[in-house]
C-alpha cells in the first residue's frame, strides 16, 4: 500500500460518500412529516399490547435500560416484579421492590422456591423475590403471590404488557411497561417466538458483529443524527515466519486505527457514512536485511442508504458501499462492497440477496476488483435452539483467468441444551478456475468440483469459573492434478476447494473477544487442508475470558502451495503434515465502550518442512475504545 493509492481511493470514494446525504436532503422534508413514532429498526414482535419480560437495570433518571427482552406470545404471565426487597413496612404490610410499593394483603400467598409456605414476617430487606400481581393506577403493586428465590443475586426484571412505543433517537426506542420508561438500544437482545437471540432494534446491516460502531444516547445530536467513533491500538510481534534457524526474521508492527461514522434516520429512511484512518510502523527483527517501513492512509468506508419496509412490509432495500457479515465469518465478513441489496424477514424466516462489486478501493487485491458478486443467504429458525442457514456465492471473473467460484453452502447451528452448542458447515464449490502455465505461458481454465466442511461442538458444564471445552474438524478438499510435472497438462475438474476470498474465519467459542479459529499464526484459508482443533476456555467473570486451543494441520493432498498464511516458508509437497499450533487468547470487556484482547500463537512445523525448521511465534495486544 502506498499513500498515493489511498489518497486516490479517498477521492474516488467521494461521490459515494455524498450519495446518502444528497438523497437525504431531497427526501428529508417529506420523510420528517410522515415519520412515525415507531422506530423503523424496532423488531416487529415488539408492539403495543405484547407481553414482555424485561431484564435490565435502573438508571439515575429513573428509566429502565433493557439488556434483554423476552416476548411471551401466549400473554399469560400477567404482571410481575423480580428483584431485591429494598425495605419493609410491617404496619402497612408493604414492601419496596424495584422502586414499586408492593401491597401485601391477607390473601397474598407467600412461599419459598421449595413451595414451603412462609409468613409476611419472613420477608426482609435483601431477599430476592418474585412478585405476581397487578399494578394499580396510583402505582401501587397489589401482590397476589410472593415467592422468595433460592439463589441471592441482584436481579432486576419486570413483566407486563407494552403500553406505548416511542422513538428516542437513531437506534433508540422507549417502551412503556408497568408505567416505567424502558430504554431499548442496539445492545438490547430480543428473544421472541421461540427463536434465537437477536437485536431488539437494529440500525446497520448486521446483527451481532463486534466490529460495528456503538450507538448510544451519548452520541446522539438532536433526534435524527448520531456521530459514532472508534479508536484502536494494536501491537503485533511476528518471529521466524520462514522457519529458518539460520536467519533472524519477523517484524514488530505497532498500529493505530480510527473510524468516524455518521448515521441519520428519518422514518423508514436511514443514511450512513464513515471515514477511516490508519497508521502502521513496521520494525524488522533484523535491521541489517530489512528496512523500517511506515504507512498511513485516510479513506472512505461504508456509505449507503437504507429504505425500510420497501418495497413492502418486512423488506428493506440498501444501496451503496456496505459491509457483508455472517456469524461464523466462514463465507464472508467485513468487506466493504458497492452493492444493491435486499433484506427480508417474516416470522422465523429471514433472507438477503445482493449484487456487488468493489468499484473504488484500489488497495484491494485484484481478485476483489475484477469480480461481480452475487450473494444470497437464507435463515430459518426452526426453534429457539436450532437454526438452518443456506448460502449462495457467485464471484464472476471476466478476465482471462476466469476465476469464477460458485459456492453453495448449508449450515446448522444448535444450542439444544444449556450445556451444549454445535455447528456444521457443508459447502460445495463449482464454477471455473484458471492458472497461468509457467512453461507454456498458456492460461489453463478448468471446471471446479470441490467440497469443504467445518463441524464442531462446545460443552459448558455451567460450574464455577464457567469452563468450556471445544472439539472441531475442518476439511477443504485438494486436487492431485496440481502436483503434475512441469509441462504436463491437468485433466478433469479441479478438486481444490477455495474459500470465497471474503472470509475471515473468526469466532469467540464462549469468549469475550473473537479470534482466528484456524490459528492465530498460521490463520490459513481452508483449501487443501484438514484441521483438527481442541480447545478449553474459562469465563471466571462476565467481562473476562481465557481460551487455550491446539490445532493440527494436514494437507489433503501433499503440495508445495499453502494459501494465505503468515508463513513465508513453503512445504516440500512430499509430506502432508504441516505441523501444529498452540494459541492463547485473553479477552477483557468491562464495558461496551472498551475492549482489551491479548493473543499468542506458537507454530511447530511438521514433516512437510525441512528437518531443521524451527518454530514461529506471534503475539498481539489490542485495545479498542468506542464512543
What is each of the regions a protein language model found here?
Residues 61, 138, 300, 334-337, ...:
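Parallel beta-helix/beta-solenoid
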Residues 311-317, 325-486, 539, 550-552, ...:
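Signature for the C-terminal beta-barrel architecture of outer-membrane proteins
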Residues 205-317, 344, 413-422, 429-433, ...:
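Beta-barrel outer-membrane channel/assembly domains of diderm bacteria
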Residues 292-293, 364-365, 400, 432-445, ...:
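Solvent-exposed loop segments that connect transmembrane elements
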Residues 61, 88, 138, 165, ...:
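Short coil/turn motifs at secondary-structure junctions
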Residues 2-11, 15-214, 286:
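Short, flexible, surface-exposed loop segments at domain boundaries
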Residues 79, 156, 171, 256, ...:
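Exposed loop/turn and edge beta-strand positions of beta-sandwich/beta-sheet ligand-binding modules
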Residues 320:
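Aromatic-lined carbohydrate-recognition surfaces of secreted/lumenal glycan-active proteins
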Amino acid at each position: 500500500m502506498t499513500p498515493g493509492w489511498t489518497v486516490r481511493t479517498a477521492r474516488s470514494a467521494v461521490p459515494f460518500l455524498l450519495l446518502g446525504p444528497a438523497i437525504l436532503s431531497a427526501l428529508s422534508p417529506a420523510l420528517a412529516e410522515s415519520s412515525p413514532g415507531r422506530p423503523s429498526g424496532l423488531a416487529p414482535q415488539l408492539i403495543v399490547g405484547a407481553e414482555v419480560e424485561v431484564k435490565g437495570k435502573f438508571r439515575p433518571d429513573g428509566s429502565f435500560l433493557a439488556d434483554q427482552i423476552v416476548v411471551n406470545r401466549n400473554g399469560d404471565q400477567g404482571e410481575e416484579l423480580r428483584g431485591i426487597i429494598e425495605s419493609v413496612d410491617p404496619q402497612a404490610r408493604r414492601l419496596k421492590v424495584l422502586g414499586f410499593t408492593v401491597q401485601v394483603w391477607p390473601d397474598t400467598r407467600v412461599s419459598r422456591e421449595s413451595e414451603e409456605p412462609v409468613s409476611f414476617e419472613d420477608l426482609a430487606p435483601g431477599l430476592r423475590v418474585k412478585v405476581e400481581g397487578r399494578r394499580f393506577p396510583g402505582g401501587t403493586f397489589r401482590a397476589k403471590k410472593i415467592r422468595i428465590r433460592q439463589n441471592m443475586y441482584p436481579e432486576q426484571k419486570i413483566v407486563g404488557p407494552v403500553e406505548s412505543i416511542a422513538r428516542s433517537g437513531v437506534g433508540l426506542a422507549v417502551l412503556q411497561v408497568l408505567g416505567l420508561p424502558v430504554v431499548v438500544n442496539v445492545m438490547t437482545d430480543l428473544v421472541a417466538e421461540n427463536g434465537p437471540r437477536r437485536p431488539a432494534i437494529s440500525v446497520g446491516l448486521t446483527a451481532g458483529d463486534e466490529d460495528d460502531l456503538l450507538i448510544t444516547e451519548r452520541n446522539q445530536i438532536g433526534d435524527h443524527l448520531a456521530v459514532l467513533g472508534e479508536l484502536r491500538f494494536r501491537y503485533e510481534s511476528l518471529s521466524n515466519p520462514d522457519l529458518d534457524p539460520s536467519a533472524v526474521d519477523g517484524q514488530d508492527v505497532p498500529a493505530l486505527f480510527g473510524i468516524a461514522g455518521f448515521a441519520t434516520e428519518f422514518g423508514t429512511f436511514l443514511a450512513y457514512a464513515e471515514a477511516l484512518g490508519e497508521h502502521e510502523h513496521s520494525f524488522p527483527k533484523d535491521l541489517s536485511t530489512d528496512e523500517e517501513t511506515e504507512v498511513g492512509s485516510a479513506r472512505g468506508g461504508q456509505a449507503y442508504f437504507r429504505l425500510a419496509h420497501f418495497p413492502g412490509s418486512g423488506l428493506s432495500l440498501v444501496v451503496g458501499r456496505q459491509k457483508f457479515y455472517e456469524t461464523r465469518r466462514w463465507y464472508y465478513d467485513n468487506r466493504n462492497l458497492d452493492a444493491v441489496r435486499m433484506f427480508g424477514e417474516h416470522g422465523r424466516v429471514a433472507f438477503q440477496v445482493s449484487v456487488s462489486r468493489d468499484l473504488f478501493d484500489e488497495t484491494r487485491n485484484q481478485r476483489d476488483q475484477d469480480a461481480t458478486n452475487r450473494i444470497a443467504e437464507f435463515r430459518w429458525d426452526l426453534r429457539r435452539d436450532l437454526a438452518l442457514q443456506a448460502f449462495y456465492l457467485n464471484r464472476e471473473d471476466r478476465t482471462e483467468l476466469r476465476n469464477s467460484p460458485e459456492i453453495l453452502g448449508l449450515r446448522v447451528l444448535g444450542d439444544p441444551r444449556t450445556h451444549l452448542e454445535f455447528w456444521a458447515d457443508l459447502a460445495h464449490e463449482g464454477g471455473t478456475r484458471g492458472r497461468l502455465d509457467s512453461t507454456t505461458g498458456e492460461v489453463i481454465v478448468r471446471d471446479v468440483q470441490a467440497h469443504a466442511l467445518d463441524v464442531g461442538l462446545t460443552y459448558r458444564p455451567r460450574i464455577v469459573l464457567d469452563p468450556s471445552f471445544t472439539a472441531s474438524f475442518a476439511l477443504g478438499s485438494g486436487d492431485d492434478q496440481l502436483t503434475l510435472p512441469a509441462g504436463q497438462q491437468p485433466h478433469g475438474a479441479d478438486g481444490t476447494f477455495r474459500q470465497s476470498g471474503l472470509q475471515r474465519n473468526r469466532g469467540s467459542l464462549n469468549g469475550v473477544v473473537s479470534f482466528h479459529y484456524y490459528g492465530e499464526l498460521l490463520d490459513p484459508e481452508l483449501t487443501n487442508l484438514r484441521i483438527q482443533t481442541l480447545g478449553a476456555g474459562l469465563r471466571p467473570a462476565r467481562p473476562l475470558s481465557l481460551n487455550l486451543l491446539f490445532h493440527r494441520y494436514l494437507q489433503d493432498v501433499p503440495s508445495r502451495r499453502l494459501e494465505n498464511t503468515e508463513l513465508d516458508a513453503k512445504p516440500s509437497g512430499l509430506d502432508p503434515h504441516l505441523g501444529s499450533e498452540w494459541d492463547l487468547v485473553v479477552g477483557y470487556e468491562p464495558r461496551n465502550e472498551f475492549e482489551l484482547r491479548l493473543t499468542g500463537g506458537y507454530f511447530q512445523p511438521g514433516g512437510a518442512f525441512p528437518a531443521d525448521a524451527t518454530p514461529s511465534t506471534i503475539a498481539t495486544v489490542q485495545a479498542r475504545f468506542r464512543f
